[in-house]
Amino acid sequence: MKLKLNFLPYFSFIPKKLNTNSIIFKIIKVFFIAILLSNSIYLSFFENIFTQTISPFLAIWGLVLLLKSKTSKQYFWIGFFVGILWFWWIGLSSIYFNLNYLVPIIPIIIGFIYGLLFRLCYLLKFDFLRLCGIFCISFIHPLGFDWFNWGIFTVYGFFDPSYRGIICIFLIAYFIYEGYISRYYKIAIVLILFFSGFQYNEKQAQTLNLNYKLINTNISQDQKFLQENLKSNSDILIQDILQAINEKKELVILPETAFAFDLKNTKYELMLKELSYKITIITGAFHVEKEHTYNSTYIFKKGNVYILNKHFLVPFGEEIPFFKDLTKKYFLKNIEEFSKGPIQSKYKLDNQIITNAICYEATKEQNYQNSQIIIALSNNAWFNNSSEYKLQQLLMKFYASKYGVSVYHATNGKENIVILPKKLLSKDWKNLSKEIFNDKK
Protein backbone atom coordinates (compact mmCIF):
# COMPACT_ATOMS: atom_id res chain seq x y z
CA MET A 1 0.00 0.00 0.00
CA LYS A 2 1.51 3.31 -1.04
CA LEU A 3 1.32 6.60 0.78
CA LYS A 4 -0.25 9.33 -1.32
CA LEU A 5 0.93 12.81 -0.40
CA ASN A 6 -2.50 14.44 -0.46
CA PHE A 7 -1.61 16.16 2.82
CA LEU A 8 1.01 18.22 0.98
CA PRO A 9 -0.88 20.37 -1.53
CA TYR A 10 0.59 23.68 -2.54
CA PHE A 11 -2.32 25.58 -1.06
CA SER A 12 -5.15 23.72 0.62
CA PHE A 13 -7.36 26.83 0.41
CA ILE A 14 -7.12 27.27 -3.39
CA PRO A 15 -10.62 27.13 -4.93
CA LYS A 16 -11.20 24.09 -7.11
CA LYS A 17 -12.35 26.24 -10.04
CA LEU A 18 -9.06 28.16 -10.16
CA ASN A 19 -7.06 27.45 -13.28
CA THR A 20 -3.91 25.79 -11.94
CA ASN A 21 -2.33 26.07 -15.37
CA SER A 22 -2.49 29.87 -15.34
CA ILE A 23 0.77 31.84 -15.27
CA ILE A 24 -0.26 33.66 -12.08
CA PHE A 25 -0.87 30.41 -10.23
CA LYS A 26 2.44 28.96 -11.42
CA ILE A 27 4.30 32.06 -10.22
CA ILE A 28 2.56 31.89 -6.84
CA LYS A 29 3.40 28.19 -6.60
CA VAL A 30 7.16 28.53 -7.23
CA PHE A 31 7.34 31.65 -5.04
CA PHE A 32 5.65 29.76 -2.20
CA ILE A 33 8.23 26.96 -2.47
CA ALA A 34 11.02 29.56 -2.40
CA ILE A 35 9.50 31.08 0.75
CA LEU A 36 9.51 27.66 2.42
CA LEU A 37 13.20 27.25 1.52
CA SER A 38 13.92 30.70 2.98
CA ASN A 39 11.68 30.47 6.03
CA SER A 40 14.52 30.37 8.59
CA ILE A 41 15.61 33.89 7.63
CA TYR A 42 12.20 35.49 7.94
CA LEU A 43 10.92 33.52 10.94
CA SER A 44 14.03 34.71 12.80
CA PHE A 45 12.31 38.11 13.06
CA PHE A 46 9.68 36.39 15.24
CA GLU A 47 11.89 34.03 17.18
CA ASN A 48 10.02 31.96 19.76
CA ILE A 49 9.62 28.30 20.66
CA PHE A 50 6.83 27.78 18.11
CA THR A 51 8.59 29.33 15.11
CA GLN A 52 11.77 27.49 16.08
CA THR A 53 9.87 24.20 16.12
CA ILE A 54 8.16 24.53 12.75
CA SER A 55 11.04 26.11 10.81
CA PRO A 56 12.92 22.93 9.74
CA PHE A 57 9.64 21.18 8.91
CA LEU A 58 8.69 24.05 6.61
CA ALA A 59 12.08 23.59 4.94
CA ILE A 60 11.34 19.87 4.51
CA TRP A 61 7.96 20.75 2.99
CA GLY A 62 9.72 23.10 0.58
CA LEU A 63 12.15 20.37 -0.50
CA VAL A 64 9.27 17.93 -1.04
CA LEU A 65 7.43 20.44 -3.21
CA LEU A 66 10.65 21.15 -5.10
CA LEU A 67 10.93 17.44 -5.93
CA LYS A 68 7.29 17.45 -7.04
CA SER A 69 8.16 20.13 -9.60
CA LYS A 70 8.47 18.29 -12.89
CA THR A 71 9.90 20.83 -15.32
CA SER A 72 13.24 22.59 -15.60
CA LYS A 73 11.38 25.92 -15.76
CA GLN A 74 9.88 25.34 -12.35
CA TYR A 75 13.31 24.53 -10.91
CA PHE A 76 14.71 27.69 -12.49
CA TRP A 77 12.05 29.97 -11.05
CA ILE A 78 12.24 28.37 -7.62
CA GLY A 79 16.00 28.97 -7.62
CA PHE A 80 15.45 32.49 -8.96
CA PHE A 81 13.14 33.43 -6.08
CA VAL A 82 15.32 31.63 -3.51
CA GLY A 83 18.30 33.72 -4.64
CA ILE A 84 16.27 36.91 -4.32
CA LEU A 85 14.73 36.02 -0.95
CA TRP A 86 18.15 35.21 0.50
CA PHE A 87 20.16 38.06 -1.04
CA TRP A 88 17.83 40.85 -2.25
CA TRP A 89 19.57 43.25 0.15
CA ILE A 90 23.00 43.09 -1.53
CA GLY A 91 22.03 45.84 -3.98
CA LEU A 92 21.31 48.28 -1.13
CA SER A 93 25.02 48.95 -0.65
CA SER A 94 25.22 50.43 -4.16
CA ILE A 95 23.24 53.44 -2.90
CA TYR A 96 26.33 54.66 -1.07
CA PHE A 97 28.38 54.56 -4.28
CA ASN A 98 25.75 56.68 -6.12
CA LEU A 99 24.69 53.64 -8.13
CA ASN A 100 21.01 53.62 -7.14
CA TYR A 101 19.97 52.09 -10.45
CA LEU A 102 21.77 48.87 -9.44
CA VAL A 103 19.48 48.31 -6.43
CA PRO A 104 16.90 46.27 -8.44
CA ILE A 105 19.39 44.94 -11.00
CA ILE A 106 21.73 43.16 -8.56
CA PRO A 107 18.99 40.96 -6.98
CA ILE A 108 17.77 39.98 -10.45
CA ILE A 109 21.30 38.94 -11.45
CA ILE A 110 21.67 36.93 -8.24
CA GLY A 111 18.27 35.32 -8.79
CA PHE A 112 19.27 34.42 -12.34
CA ILE A 113 22.49 32.76 -11.10
CA TYR A 114 20.68 30.61 -8.53
CA GLY A 115 17.93 29.89 -11.04
CA LEU A 116 20.55 28.46 -13.40
CA LEU A 117 22.08 26.39 -10.60
CA PHE A 118 18.70 24.91 -9.68
CA ARG A 119 17.95 24.25 -13.35
CA LEU A 120 21.29 22.44 -13.74
CA CYS A 121 20.26 20.20 -10.84
CA TYR A 122 17.08 19.32 -12.71
CA LEU A 123 19.19 17.99 -15.59
CA LEU A 124 20.25 15.12 -13.33
CA LYS A 125 18.12 12.16 -14.34
CA PHE A 126 16.84 10.89 -10.98
CA ASP A 127 15.03 12.80 -8.24
CA PHE A 128 17.52 11.66 -5.61
CA LEU A 129 20.40 13.01 -7.69
CA ARG A 130 18.52 16.27 -8.19
CA LEU A 131 18.16 16.63 -4.44
CA CYS A 132 21.86 15.85 -4.00
CA GLY A 133 22.59 18.60 -6.52
CA ILE A 134 20.46 21.09 -4.59
CA PHE A 135 22.30 20.08 -1.41
CA CYS A 136 25.67 20.67 -3.11
CA ILE A 137 24.77 24.22 -4.16
CA SER A 138 25.59 25.10 -0.56
CA PHE A 139 29.25 24.37 -1.38
CA ILE A 140 29.42 26.72 -4.36
CA HIS A 141 30.99 29.99 -3.21
CA PRO A 142 31.21 32.57 -6.02
CA LEU A 143 34.04 35.03 -5.24
CA GLY A 144 34.34 33.35 -1.84
CA PHE A 145 30.82 34.45 -0.86
CA ASP A 146 29.55 31.52 1.21
CA TRP A 147 26.34 32.84 2.73
CA PHE A 148 24.16 30.36 0.85
CA ASN A 149 24.29 27.60 3.42
CA TRP A 150 21.54 25.05 4.07
CA GLY A 151 22.97 24.77 7.59
CA ILE A 152 20.61 27.55 8.66
CA PHE A 153 17.81 24.95 8.50
CA THR A 154 19.27 23.39 11.67
CA VAL A 155 19.73 26.59 13.70
CA TYR A 156 16.14 26.17 14.86
CA GLY A 157 14.21 23.02 15.68
CA PHE A 158 15.10 19.56 16.92
CA PHE A 159 17.82 18.75 14.39
CA ASP A 160 21.51 18.76 15.26
CA PRO A 161 23.29 21.90 13.96
CA SER A 162 25.75 19.95 11.83
CA TYR A 163 25.92 18.18 8.49
CA ARG A 164 24.31 15.18 10.18
CA GLY A 165 21.21 17.27 10.84
CA ILE A 166 21.20 18.85 7.38
CA ILE A 167 21.60 15.53 5.55
CA CYS A 168 18.76 14.00 7.57
CA ILE A 169 16.49 16.94 6.68
CA PHE A 170 17.18 16.37 2.97
CA LEU A 171 16.72 12.60 3.26
CA ILE A 172 13.44 12.99 5.16
CA ALA A 173 12.18 15.21 2.35
CA TYR A 174 13.20 12.62 -0.24
CA PHE A 175 11.52 9.68 1.47
CA ILE A 176 8.33 11.66 2.11
CA TYR A 177 8.28 12.48 -1.60
CA GLU A 178 9.21 8.99 -2.81
CA GLY A 179 6.11 7.19 -4.07
CA TYR A 180 7.47 3.65 -4.45
CA ILE A 181 7.72 2.75 -0.78
CA SER A 182 4.83 1.41 1.26
CA ARG A 183 3.25 3.63 3.90
CA TYR A 184 4.62 1.76 6.92
CA TYR A 185 8.16 1.51 5.56
CA LYS A 186 8.02 5.20 4.75
CA ILE A 187 6.92 6.14 8.27
CA ALA A 188 9.64 3.93 9.76
CA ILE A 189 12.36 5.42 7.52
CA VAL A 190 11.28 9.00 8.28
CA LEU A 191 11.27 8.32 12.03
CA ILE A 192 14.70 6.68 11.86
CA LEU A 193 16.06 9.68 9.95
CA PHE A 194 14.42 12.13 12.35
CA PHE A 195 16.02 10.51 15.38
CA SER A 196 19.31 10.09 13.52
CA GLY A 197 19.41 13.84 12.90
CA PHE A 198 18.07 14.74 16.35
CA GLN A 199 20.14 16.97 18.64
CA TYR A 200 20.92 14.97 21.76
CA ASN A 201 23.69 17.07 23.31
CA GLU A 202 24.53 20.70 23.89
CA LYS A 203 28.08 21.80 23.18
CA GLN A 204 29.66 23.83 25.94
CA ALA A 205 31.55 26.96 24.98
CA GLN A 206 33.99 29.10 26.90
CA THR A 207 32.69 32.53 27.86
CA LEU A 208 34.60 35.70 28.60
CA ASN A 209 36.08 35.85 32.08
CA LEU A 210 36.12 39.64 31.99
CA ASN A 211 33.13 41.78 32.92
CA TYR A 212 32.37 43.24 29.50
CA LYS A 213 30.09 45.72 27.74
CA LEU A 214 29.09 45.66 24.06
CA ILE A 215 28.61 49.15 22.65
CA ASN A 216 25.88 49.52 20.05
CA THR A 217 25.86 52.51 17.69
CA ASN A 218 23.22 53.58 15.21
CA ILE A 219 24.94 55.84 12.68
CA SER A 220 23.53 55.74 9.16
CA GLN A 221 25.95 54.78 6.41
CA ASP A 222 25.55 58.06 4.54
CA GLN A 223 26.61 59.99 7.66
CA LYS A 224 29.24 57.69 9.13
CA PHE A 225 32.27 58.74 7.07
CA LEU A 226 31.48 62.43 6.55
CA GLN A 227 34.40 64.54 7.72
CA GLU A 228 32.17 66.94 9.68
CA ASN A 229 30.73 64.05 11.73
CA LEU A 230 33.95 62.28 12.72
CA LYS A 231 34.69 64.39 15.79
CA SER A 232 31.17 64.34 17.25
CA ASN A 233 30.77 60.59 16.67
CA SER A 234 34.19 59.88 18.19
CA ASP A 235 33.43 62.04 21.24
CA ILE A 236 30.24 60.04 21.83
CA LEU A 237 32.29 56.83 21.74
CA ILE A 238 34.67 58.22 24.35
CA GLN A 239 31.66 58.98 26.55
CA ASP A 240 30.42 55.40 26.06
CA ILE A 241 33.81 54.09 27.20
CA LEU A 242 33.78 56.39 30.25
CA GLN A 243 30.29 55.11 31.06
CA ALA A 244 31.57 51.52 30.91
CA ILE A 245 34.37 52.48 33.31
CA ASN A 246 31.81 54.00 35.70
CA GLU A 247 29.87 50.73 35.50
CA LYS A 248 33.02 48.90 36.67
CA LYS A 249 33.40 47.00 33.40
CA GLU A 250 36.76 45.43 32.60
CA LEU A 251 36.29 45.23 28.83
CA VAL A 252 34.42 47.39 26.33
CA ILE A 253 33.79 46.29 22.72
CA LEU A 254 32.88 48.79 19.99
CA PRO A 255 31.67 48.07 16.41
CA GLU A 256 33.55 47.87 13.13
CA THR A 257 35.04 51.25 12.07
CA ALA A 258 33.52 52.84 15.16
CA PHE A 259 36.30 55.40 14.72
CA ALA A 260 35.86 55.97 10.99
CA PHE A 261 39.45 57.00 10.27
CA ASP A 262 43.04 55.88 10.79
CA LEU A 263 43.49 55.99 14.58
CA LYS A 264 47.27 55.99 14.55
CA ASN A 265 48.94 59.21 15.68
CA THR A 266 45.66 60.95 16.50
CA LYS A 267 44.48 62.51 19.74
CA TYR A 268 41.92 59.72 20.05
CA GLU A 269 44.64 57.09 20.04
CA LEU A 270 46.28 58.93 22.95
CA MET A 271 42.96 59.16 24.78
CA LEU A 272 42.23 55.46 24.27
CA LYS A 273 45.70 54.50 25.46
CA GLU A 274 45.15 56.54 28.61
CA LEU A 275 41.70 55.04 29.21
CA SER A 276 43.08 51.53 28.65
CA TYR A 277 44.76 51.68 32.06
CA LYS A 278 41.23 51.54 33.50
CA ILE A 279 39.52 49.27 30.96
CA THR A 280 40.53 47.12 27.99
CA ILE A 281 39.15 48.63 24.77
CA ILE A 282 38.43 46.79 21.52
CA THR A 283 37.29 48.93 18.62
CA GLY A 284 37.17 49.02 14.85
CA ALA A 285 39.01 51.66 12.80
CA PHE A 286 41.13 52.05 9.69
CA HIS A 287 44.86 51.39 9.71
CA VAL A 288 47.16 52.85 7.07
CA GLU A 289 50.66 51.45 6.76
CA LYS A 290 53.14 51.75 3.87
CA GLU A 291 50.48 52.79 1.34
CA HIS A 292 48.24 49.90 2.41
CA THR A 293 44.85 50.57 4.00
CA TYR A 294 43.36 47.96 6.32
CA ASN A 295 39.98 47.48 7.97
CA SER A 296 41.24 46.74 11.46
CA THR A 297 40.55 45.89 15.06
CA TYR A 298 42.44 47.99 17.61
CA ILE A 299 43.04 46.55 21.07
CA PHE A 300 44.03 49.03 23.78
CA LYS A 301 45.33 47.40 26.93
CA LYS A 302 47.34 48.95 29.78
CA GLY A 303 48.62 51.78 27.61
CA ASN A 304 49.57 49.55 24.68
CA VAL A 305 47.87 49.21 21.31
CA TYR A 306 47.65 46.06 19.17
CA ILE A 307 46.29 46.12 15.61
CA LEU A 308 44.70 43.13 13.84
CA ASN A 309 43.84 43.51 10.15
CA LYS A 310 40.88 41.98 8.33
CA HIS A 311 41.68 39.12 5.95
CA PHE A 312 38.36 38.15 4.31
CA LEU A 313 37.29 41.17 2.26
CA VAL A 314 33.84 41.74 0.77
CA PRO A 315 33.91 41.42 -3.06
CA PHE A 316 33.21 44.78 -4.75
CA GLY A 317 32.79 46.38 -1.31
CA GLU A 318 36.29 46.17 0.15
CA GLU A 319 38.17 44.76 -2.81
CA ILE A 320 37.64 44.42 -6.55
CA PRO A 321 38.37 40.76 -7.41
CA PHE A 322 38.58 41.26 -11.19
CA PHE A 323 38.16 43.87 -13.95
CA LYS A 324 39.60 46.46 -11.58
CA ASP A 325 40.24 49.21 -14.13
CA LEU A 326 36.85 48.78 -15.78
CA THR A 327 35.01 48.67 -12.45
CA LYS A 328 36.76 51.75 -11.09
CA LYS A 329 36.21 53.69 -14.31
CA TYR A 330 32.49 53.08 -14.75
CA PHE A 331 31.12 51.96 -11.38
CA LEU A 332 33.17 52.29 -8.19
CA LYS A 333 35.05 55.47 -9.04
CA ASN A 334 35.73 56.53 -5.45
CA ILE A 335 36.31 53.14 -3.87
CA GLU A 336 39.44 52.65 -1.83
CA GLU A 337 40.40 48.99 -1.77
CA PHE A 338 41.60 47.40 1.44
CA SER A 339 44.63 45.18 1.83
CA LYS A 340 44.43 41.75 3.47
CA GLY A 341 45.73 40.83 6.90
CA PRO A 342 46.57 37.32 8.20
CA ILE A 343 44.00 34.59 7.61
CA GLN A 344 43.15 34.15 11.30
CA SER A 345 44.12 36.76 13.89
CA LYS A 346 44.12 35.86 17.57
CA TYR A 347 44.97 37.65 20.79
CA LYS A 348 44.88 36.99 24.52
CA LEU A 349 42.58 38.50 27.14
CA ASP A 350 42.80 37.38 30.77
CA ASN A 351 44.56 34.15 29.72
CA GLN A 352 41.85 33.36 27.16
CA ILE A 353 42.62 33.10 23.44
CA ILE A 354 40.27 35.28 21.39
CA THR A 355 39.72 35.04 17.62
CA ASN A 356 39.25 38.37 15.91
CA ALA A 357 36.49 38.74 13.28
CA ILE A 358 35.36 41.83 11.42
CA CYS A 359 31.83 41.65 9.94
CA TYR A 360 32.08 39.31 6.92
CA GLU A 361 34.75 37.27 8.76
CA ALA A 362 32.25 36.37 11.48
CA THR A 363 30.46 34.13 8.97
CA LYS A 364 33.59 32.32 7.77
CA GLU A 365 33.76 28.69 8.89
CA GLN A 366 37.59 28.82 8.99
CA ASN A 367 37.41 31.30 11.87
CA TYR A 368 35.39 28.88 14.00
CA GLN A 369 37.80 26.01 13.56
CA ASN A 370 40.33 25.93 16.40
CA SER A 371 38.52 28.80 18.14
CA GLN A 372 36.79 28.99 21.50
CA ILE A 373 35.77 32.64 21.75
CA ILE A 374 35.21 35.07 18.88
CA ILE A 375 34.84 38.81 19.34
CA ALA A 376 33.19 40.15 16.18
CA LEU A 377 32.74 43.75 15.09
CA SER A 378 30.24 44.69 12.36
CA ASN A 379 28.78 47.66 10.52
CA ASN A 380 25.32 46.56 9.37
CA ALA A 381 24.30 50.07 8.31
CA TRP A 382 25.33 49.18 4.75
CA PHE A 383 22.15 47.08 4.51
CA ASN A 384 19.76 48.95 6.77
CA ASN A 385 16.09 47.85 6.88
CA SER A 386 16.88 44.45 5.40
CA SER A 387 17.20 40.79 6.33
CA GLU A 388 21.02 40.84 5.94
CA TYR A 389 21.80 40.91 9.64
CA LYS A 390 19.39 38.06 10.35
CA LEU A 391 21.11 35.82 7.81
CA GLN A 392 24.46 36.87 9.27
CA GLN A 393 23.27 35.88 12.75
CA LEU A 394 21.91 32.53 11.51
CA LEU A 395 25.26 31.66 9.94
CA MET A 396 27.09 32.67 13.11
CA LYS A 397 24.70 30.57 15.21
CA PHE A 398 25.18 27.56 12.94
CA TYR A 399 28.99 27.66 13.11
CA ALA A 400 29.01 28.52 16.82
CA SER A 401 26.81 25.48 17.49
CA LYS A 402 28.77 23.22 15.16
CA TYR A 403 32.15 24.03 16.71
CA GLY A 404 31.17 24.93 20.28
CA VAL A 405 32.22 28.60 20.09
CA SER A 406 30.87 31.69 21.85
CA VAL A 407 30.56 34.90 19.80
CA TYR A 408 30.41 38.44 21.18
CA HIS A 409 29.10 40.68 18.40
CA ALA A 410 29.15 44.50 18.58
CA THR A 411 27.42 46.25 15.69
CA ASN A 412 26.51 49.57 14.16
CA GLY A 413 23.02 49.78 12.72
CA LYS A 414 21.52 46.67 14.35
CA GLU A 415 21.33 45.13 17.80
CA ASN A 416 24.33 43.54 19.51
CA ILE A 417 24.17 39.83 20.23
CA VAL A 418 25.97 37.19 22.26
CA ILE A 419 25.79 33.80 20.56
CA LEU A 420 26.28 30.49 22.35
CA PRO A 421 25.92 26.93 20.98
CA LYS A 422 22.35 25.81 20.34
CA LYS A 423 20.35 24.63 23.32
CA LEU A 424 18.12 21.56 23.19
CA LEU A 425 14.68 22.55 21.96
CA SER A 426 13.27 19.47 23.66
CA LYS A 427 14.35 21.00 26.99
CA ASP A 428 12.52 24.22 26.18
CA TRP A 429 9.34 22.29 25.45
CA LYS A 430 9.74 20.32 28.67
CA ASN A 431 10.16 23.53 30.67
CA LEU A 432 7.17 25.13 28.93
CA SER A 433 5.03 22.08 29.72
CA LYS A 434 6.02 22.29 33.38
CA GLU A 435 5.09 25.98 33.49
CA ILE A 436 1.71 25.31 31.90
CA PHE A 437 0.86 22.46 34.29
CA ASN A 438 2.11 24.42 37.32
CA ASP A 439 -0.09 27.37 36.35
CA LYS A 440 -3.11 25.06 36.12
CA LYS A 441 -2.42 23.76 39.61
Curated annotation (Swiss-Prot):
<dbReference type="InterPro" id="IPR036526">
    <property type="entry name" value="C-N_Hydrolase_sf"/>
</dbReference>
<dbReference type="GO" id="GO:0005886">
    <property type="term" value="C:plasma membrane"/>
</dbReference>
<feature type="transmembrane region" description="Helical">
    <location>
        <begin position="156"/>
        <end position="176"/>
    </location>
</feature>
<feature type="transmembrane region" description="Helical">
    <location>
        <begin position="97"/>
        <end position="117"/>
    </location>
</feature>
<feature type="active site" description="Proton acceptor">
    <location>
        <position position="256"/>
    </location>
</feature>
<keyword id="KW-0997">Cell inner membrane</keyword>
<dbReference type="InterPro" id="IPR004563">
    <property type="entry name" value="Apolipo_AcylTrfase"/>
</dbReference>
<dbReference type="GO" id="GO:0042158">
    <property type="term" value="P:lipoprotein biosynthetic process"/>
</dbReference>
<keyword id="KW-0812">Transmembrane</keyword>
<keyword id="KW-1003">Cell membrane</keyword>
<feature type="active site" description="Nucleophile">
    <location>
        <position position="359"/>
    </location>
</feature>
<feature type="domain" description="CN hydrolase">
    <location>
        <begin position="215"/>
        <end position="441"/>
    </location>
</feature>
<dbReference type="GO" id="GO:0016410">
    <property type="term" value="F:N-acyltransferase activity"/>
</dbReference>
<feature type="transmembrane region" description="Helical">
    <location>
        <begin position="178"/>
        <end position="198"/>
    </location>
</feature>
<feature type="active site">
    <location>
        <position position="310"/>
    </location>
</feature>
<comment type="pathway">
    <text>Protein modification; lipoprotein biosynthesis (N-acyl transfer).</text>
</comment>
<feature type="transmembrane region" description="Helical">
    <location>
        <begin position="133"/>
        <end position="153"/>
    </location>
</feature>
<feature type="transmembrane region" description="Helical">
    <location>
        <begin position="75"/>
        <end position="95"/>
    </location>
</feature>
<keyword id="KW-0808">Transferase</keyword>
<dbReference type="InterPro" id="IPR003010">
    <property type="entry name" value="C-N_Hydrolase"/>
</dbReference>
<keyword id="KW-1133">Transmembrane helix</keyword>
<comment type="function">
    <text>Catalyzes the phospholipid dependent N-acylation of the N-terminal cysteine of apolipoprotein, the last step in lipoprotein maturation.</text>
</comment>
<keyword id="KW-0012">Acyltransferase</keyword>
<comment type="similarity">
    <text>Belongs to the CN hydrolase family. Apolipoprotein N-acyltransferase subfamily.</text>
</comment>
<feature type="transmembrane region" description="Helical">
    <location>
        <begin position="23"/>
        <end position="43"/>
    </location>
</feature>
<protein>
    <recommendedName>
        <fullName>Apolipoprotein N-acyltransferase</fullName>
        <ecNumber>2.3.1.269</ecNumber>
    </recommendedName>
</protein>
<keyword id="KW-0472">Membrane</keyword>
<feature type="transmembrane region" description="Helical">
    <location>
        <begin position="45"/>
        <end position="65"/>
    </location>
</feature>
